[in-house]
Amino acid sequence: MSEIDWRKMPPLTALRAFAATASEGGFSAAARKLNVTHAAIAQQVRALEADLDVPLVWRDGKHLHLTPEGERFAKALADGFSMIQSAADMLRADTSEKALTVTVPPVFASEWLMPRLARFWKKHPDIPLSLLPDARLVDLKEIGANIGIRFGVGKWPGVISVFLTAAPQVVVAAPELLGGRKKLSLREMAMLPWVREGDWPEQMQLLESMGLVPAALKFVDFPNEELALAAAREGIGLHLETEALIVEDLKLGWLVKIHELTEESLGYYIVRPPGRLNPAAKIFIDWLKAEA
């Protein structure tokens, strides 16, 4: 293939205008196709004819026709643009097969996923990964996510769910709130303030399953789990949390576990839409399960 002399190459806008004129059969139709004005298309085609010093179109009343030279050039452009589009589509497909978008509860992302994520990137540096922290049950397709991680019992409509890890719930508190105690009776827990996140209604049922009366407890409310957990670390109140998310807090003594719930149905699940799985998503799912 001979080297391209870019200085002799006609402007791309003029080539597009003529190719559209040839395929659509006129300036007006080409203008609609390219979302520009009739005058802009006509001007570009005239400029191309001047650049090539060859007539490409001719008029017969209201009808526009291609000259023999115009027909040959239009075919060459159609073939060339078709090859460019095919190559671009292949690149986009390759990129979309590798790209991965994951929706995940914010605290799970910060406390469980982020400490492990460097290992994934080290092993798979070619997979672009985007995290969408969101505590809501979002529609994966609507937000453009390949997979999601959800907390619950593993039953949600419209998705395939795969168990990732158990989520035993524990009651924790900062050491200063407990005054040196390691365990509290139900009566003692009922007398202390509680830190609560507003977007987790099931926590009231869990507290009730412990033998507490939620309506009689004093709550300090926070809009999300991140702030509620931060408040618990500061000693503002007792807090119900997934043990897997506070392993470091317990190990370092920032929080003390004072009660374990026996509820075993809760867990974190990987969810995805039905149908073919993105290859990058399969790699990430396999890695998640190995980490868990």
Swiss-Prot record:
The keyword Transferase does not apply. It comes from the Bacteria. InterPro entries: LysR_subst-bd, Tscrpt_reg_HTH_LysR, WH-like_DNA-bd_sf, WH_DNA-bd_sf. SUPFAM superfamilies: Periplasmic binding protein-like II (SSF53850), Winged helix' DNA-binding domain (SSF46785). Keywords: Activator, DNA-binding, Transcription, Transcription regulation. Residues 10-67 form the HTH lysR-type domain. Pfam families: HTH_1 (PF00126), LysR_substrate (PF03466). One of its GO terms (molecular function) is sequence-specific DNA binding. GO terms for biological process: DNA-templated transcription. The keyword Transcription applies. Residues 27-46 bind DNA. Functions as a low-light activator of ahcY expression (gene for S-adenosyl-L-homocysteine hydrolase) and as a high-light activator of an uncharacterized 21.6 kDa protein in the ahcY-hvrB intergenic region (orf5). It is also a negative regulator of its own expression. Belongs to the LysR transcriptional regulatory family. This is AhcY transcriptional activator HvrB. It comes from Rhodobacter capsulatus (strain ATCC BAA-309 / NBRC 16581 / SB1003).
